[in-house]
Amino acid sequence: MNAIEIRGLSKRFGSKQAVDNLNMTVPEGAIYGFIGENGSGKSTTEKMICGLLHPTSGSIQLYGKDHNDDEIRSRIGVLIEAPGCFPDCSVWNNMMIQAANLEIKNPEQEIAKVLKTVRMEGAASNKFKNCSLGMKQRIGIAMALLGNPRLLVLDEPINGLDADGMRIMREVLTDITQNYHCTVLISSHILGELEKIATHYGIIRHGRMIREMTAEELEADCPTYIALRTGEGSKIKLLLKGKYDRVEEEEDGTIRIYDDVKSEDVVAYLYEKGVTVSEIWTAKIGLEEYYIELMGGKKQ
């Protein structure tokens, strides 16, 4: 069963078409990376999924039921924008308030569980206003986990975090899918981090889905290349273009060769031409470069 099944979804705000005939499929249990530039329609789509906005047209099914179904709506955890917390209250008291809003009876055990899941069990007595950005985001996720949701919708939860905060967030999201058995829809502009956790991707542009794929399909679509440095970038690029089909130069002078060729053969060829290679290695393009090329920003 799919967690989310969207067909022909559109949303207009006056004359602005925010979402345009969008089709989208999120399998149950996936960590679905939702990708697009600012204004592409990501947040609008997420808000329609959560019932915070009404579609102009189209359908949204969650676990085979209409997204307005009361039972389904009660099983969606949401973190869109900043978590709504009282700054002078402790983390624990904010969690208790949220549990009361959700009419959770005897919530202490569940609150302790979700705080442990998001690595915040040692900060329960801290005032919310004294928490770091990363801690606040994890508190927001803990609130979204109250009530044991089947679907978790997170809008840009890792933006602005430092390296350690991102690492913790990766661990938290992985634990959530394993221990709560819920599906995670997550949007982010930090594609390098998203690539480390996502099992599926959807890329949206101008309100339309332009590509959906699994992590395995992304891996297959991202070519391996040989990278090298010689200190004579542009000159060597011209030399190599005479022998190989796809040769590119990065801003720092690194040359990339995308042909199916061995690095030792490249070194030998350049040696014959009187060029000494200072560094050479094999690498693979990732999600960020894949996205840039898909958007038409391919380097020449």
Describe these PLM feature segments.
Residues 4, 11-186, 191-205, 209-211:
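ABC transporter nucleotide-binding domains
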Residues 1-10, 297-300:
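ABC-family P-loop ATPase nucleotide-binding domain
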Residues 170-258:
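ABC transporter nucleotide-binding domain
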Residues 66-67, 231-233, 260-261, 285:
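Short, surface-exposed acidic/glycine-rich loop or hinge patches that mediate macromolecular interfaces
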Residues 258-300:
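C-terminal coupling/interaction segments
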Residues 72, 236-239, 266, 270:
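Hydrophobic side chains in well-ordered alpha-helices
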Residues 103, 119, 243-244, 274:
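Glycine-centered loop/turn motif at secondary-structure junctions
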